[in-house]
């Protein structure tokens, strides 16, 4: 009898860290439900890579900030199937000093990064509780641990994710669901491409930017290690930037 492949739901999986996590889990034998908002070309490219690795990848487009869109996309899928893993990786920036920040810049970041977590995870937790198993990994940021000038909105959203994940871990741990947070620092992605390395690297004791694979390897461990005893924790991947 062929063993049923596990399913990983990757929220925000078409580029950057999400793409790296998707490919790492596909190599580990997971089939994927991969969500994205607008970049269909990038999402299709990830699906093609996953299929090359021998896995299946279902693309699910929606805006995480819309509860109605999330519910319409996920509720029916999860009536009879629970994903084994949820990786919440949705995140945007609208950087500005608070004194100049518009309400739109604040709302856009909080609704995508933090409200989106509620919109998605509420759907998934019901299914995981019914299945009495699951792994949830939330991608936060060092900005949510120490704050960054010019990122009051982003830092608030990422700190909120840490608090939400810790509270959720207390709610569902006894039901067989393991919840953890990964907090990357400066990782080489589109989001950090404009950073001046000459100014950034002196802040990092390991003297390099992180790679997507640095993050993906930790997420893979949290999603696959049997008898996991790491629960409700924030794992920094930052080269020593935050200790």
What are the residue ranges of the model-derived segments?
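Active-site helix of classical SDR
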Residues: 121, 157, 165
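Short, small/polar-rich loop/turn modules that mediate ligand/substrate recognition or access, typified
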Residues: 173, 178, 230-232
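Conserved glycine-rich cofactor-binding loop
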Residues: 14-16
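Conserved glycine-rich Rossmann-like NAD(P)H-binding loop of the short-chain dehydrogenase/reductase
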Residues: 30-45
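Residue(s) in the substrate-gating loop at a strand-loop-helix junction
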Residues: 141
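Substrate-binding pocket helix/loop in short-chain dehydrogenase/reductase
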Residues: 97-98, 105-110, 136, 200
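C-terminal substrate-recognition "lid" of short-chain dehydrogenase/reductases
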Residues: 133, 211-237, 242
